[in-house]
């Protein structure tokens, strides 16, 4: 008897939920099957459920409700992605970049493919605490591709925090209390992926280098991966004799797989293109 009552309670709960999501409408009608149908999508809003001792009619969601639920889920997902992008502190100019929008060339094809595979296999990368070191000359696309990875992950609801060592130091100087600084560090540690842009551009004071090391070491201890971009070469990082820098670079090289970026600066290419376009326009050749 108790088992039967429990079964009835579950059925009643299902029926109540369906009724709440899909209440009757004056325009709804009884179809040839004897069930209530939606006046808009023409689908049943009821279902006959055959039990061992009887048949009961229970409310169900029609296609209109299912479609609305799907739209609500899409809206919630979009809001979550937008929130992740706001929290990521990514520069606005990078928030729409994607692997599909990057101009591919002989020089960057391999780098794009590796970064894309890293993003697509991030669950495994996260499990291994495996990061990336994107290194090479100025303007070769390191920051752009790191942001492509970030956007791919955030579109899949993975939290990312991206900043530079220079900005970290600037932010810390602006905090009014030690608690603010601790909360800032915790945000970096909590993110599923942390992107540190332009390592090596920070001032070489003991304080600055200690902060950078603490941030990187915090990621190491939290077991969460990071991506580091730098204009330094592997030789410069491996051969560094300054102990303050050396321990930073050693930790990065321990955690991050290196990908070299070579070729002509993308920024210089873009500047040259803009120059040519303006020349044609101003000379009346456009």
Language-model regions, residue ranges each:
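Short glycine-rich substrate-engagement loop in P-loop NTPases that contacts/grips substrate
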Residues: 107-116, 127, 150-190, 203-210
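Walker B catalytic acidic pair
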Residues: 198-199
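Pre-Walker A (pre-P-loop) alpha-helix and adjacent loop at the N terminus of AAA/AAA+ ATPase modules
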Residues: 93, 101-132
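Loop/turn-to-beta-strand initiation segments
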Residues: 158-159, 190-193, 222-228
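Walker A/P-loop nucleotide-binding motif
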Residues: 124-146
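Hydrophobic/aromatic beta-strand patches that form the interior of the parallel beta-sheet core
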Residues: 132, 161, 195, 227, ...
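A short, basic N-terminal segment
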Residues: 1-110, 269-286
């Amino acid at each position: 008897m108790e088992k039967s009552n429990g079964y009835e309670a579950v059925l009643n709960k299902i029926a109540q939920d369906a009724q709440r999501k899909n209440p009757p409408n004056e325009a709804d009608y009884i179809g040839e099957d004897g069930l209530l149908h939606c006046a808009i999508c023409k689908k049943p809003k009821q279902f006959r459920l055959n039990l061992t001792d009887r048949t009961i009619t229970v409310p169900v969601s029609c296609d209109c409700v299912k479609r609305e639920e799907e739209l609500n889920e899409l809206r919630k997902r979009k809001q979550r992605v937008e929130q992740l992008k706001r929290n990521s502190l990514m520069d606005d100019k990078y928030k729409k970049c994607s692997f599909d929008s990057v101009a591919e060339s002989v020089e960057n094809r391999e780098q794009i493919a590796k970064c894309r595979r890293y993003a697509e296999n991030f669950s495994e990368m996260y499990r291994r605490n495996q990061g990336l070191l994107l290194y090479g000359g100025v303007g070769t696309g390191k920051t752009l591709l790191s942001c492509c990875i970030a956007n791919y992950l955030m579109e899949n609801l993975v939290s990312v925090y991206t900043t530079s060592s220079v900005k970290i130091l600037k932010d810390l100087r602006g905090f009014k209390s030690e608690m603010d600084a601790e909360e800032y560090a915790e945000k970096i540690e909590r993110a599923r992926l942390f992107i540190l842009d332009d390592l090596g551009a920070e001032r070489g004071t003991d304080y600055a280098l200690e902060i950078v090391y603490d941030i990187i070491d915090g990621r190491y201890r939290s077991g969460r991966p990071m991506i580091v971009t730098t204009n330094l070469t592997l030789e410069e990082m491996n051969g560094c004799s300054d102990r303050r820098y050396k321990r930073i670079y050693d930790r990065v090289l321990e955690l991050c797989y290196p990908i070299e970026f070579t070729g002509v600066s993308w920024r210089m290419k873009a500047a040259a293109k803009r120059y040519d376009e303006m020349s044609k326009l101003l000379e009346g050749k456009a």
